[in-house]
């Protein structure tokens, strides 16, 4: 084997080994891992590991026969099950297949995701009814969180969506939300969010 072929083989072996290590890290973590933490653990530079992550994502996300995929969210990576298999995963975990949100919670969530940061009073005004229990349910489900306080008397809480919201709805960021114009057929929802 020539020196050039030996170097290429060595580089391929190194990449395969690092991809294997990264897969293991993502698997055992169960939580999103920051790219900088992966770099620190495998002792490689940011750009190199970022390229490896892209390759791994292409492998997992491009193969329809696999039941898992890698998602990227705000500079973190996580190994998750594919949405199409959620029904079966839920059966294994013996949870309700659908832990549905009430209409009030869905309305509140729609308003928060399009108008954030927003106060409870502003949500109440848009909906025309009290939203406190709906917002509390969204907070309990980790879809919404306190993002700060409005600098006015009483300093009301500002609400916004969480990374869990993005993961739950398979969004990379809020820019992936459907345009509000898509909801124009449902004037009630459109009017609530546009107010």
UniProtKB/Swiss-Prot annotation:
Task: Name one cellular component (GO) term.
Answer: cytoplasm
Q: Per the record's keyword annotation, is Chaperone included, yes or no?
A: no
Alphabetical list of HAMAP family matching this protein: ScpB (MF_01804)
> Any idea which UniProt keywords this protein has?
Cell cycle, Cell division, Chromosome partition, Cytoplasm
Compartments reported by the entry: Cytoplasm
- Write down the NCBIfam families for this protein, in alphabetical order: SMC-Scp complex subunit ScpB
Q: What are the GO BP annotations of this UniProt entry?
A: cell division; chromosome separation; DNA replication
What this chain does, per the entry, is described as: Participates in chromosomal partition during cell division. May act via the formation of a condensin-like complex containing Smc and ScpA that pull DNA away from mid-cell into both cell halves.
User: What name goes with this protein?
Assistant: Segregation and condensation protein B
UniProt similarity note: Belongs to the ScpB family.
Task: State the Gene3D superfamilies in the record.
Answer: Winged helix-like DNA-binding domain superfamily/Winged helix DNA-binding domain (1.10.10.10)
Name the InterPro entries on file. Answer: ScpB_csome_segregation, WH-like_DNA-bd_sf, WH_DNA-bd_sf
Q: How does it assemble?
A: Homodimer. Homodimerization may be required to stabilize the binding of ScpA to the Smc head domains. Component of a cohesin-like complex composed of ScpA, ScpB and the Smc homodimer, in which ScpA and ScpB bind to the head domain of Smc. The presence of the three proteins is required for the association of the complex with DNA.
Query: Transport among the record's keywords?
Result: no
């Amino acid at each position: 084997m020539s020196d050039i072929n030996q170097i290429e083989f060595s580089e391929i072996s190194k990449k395969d080994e690092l991809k294997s290590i990264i897969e293991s890290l993502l698997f055992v973590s169960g939580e999103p891992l920051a790219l900088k933490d992966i770099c620190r653990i495998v002792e490689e530079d940011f750009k190199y590991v970022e390229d490896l992550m892209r390759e791994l994502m292409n492998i997992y996300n491009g193969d329809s026969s696999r039941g898992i995929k890698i998602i990227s969210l705000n500079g973190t990576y996580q190994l998750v099950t594919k949405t199409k298999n959620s029904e079966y995963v839920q059966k294994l975990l013996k949870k309700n297949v659908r832990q549905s949100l009430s209409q009030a919670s869905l309305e509140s969530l729609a308003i928060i995701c399009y108008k954030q940061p927003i106060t409870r009073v502003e949500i109440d005004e848009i909906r025309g009814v009290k939203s406190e229990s709906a917002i509390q349910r969204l907070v309990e489900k980790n879809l919404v969180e306190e993002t700060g306080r409005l600098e006015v008397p009483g300093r009301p809480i500002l609400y916004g969506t969480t990374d869990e919201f993005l993961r739950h709805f398979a969004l990379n960021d809020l820019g992936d939300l459907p345009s509000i114009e898509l909801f124009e057929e449902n004037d009630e929802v459109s009017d609530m969010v546009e107010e």
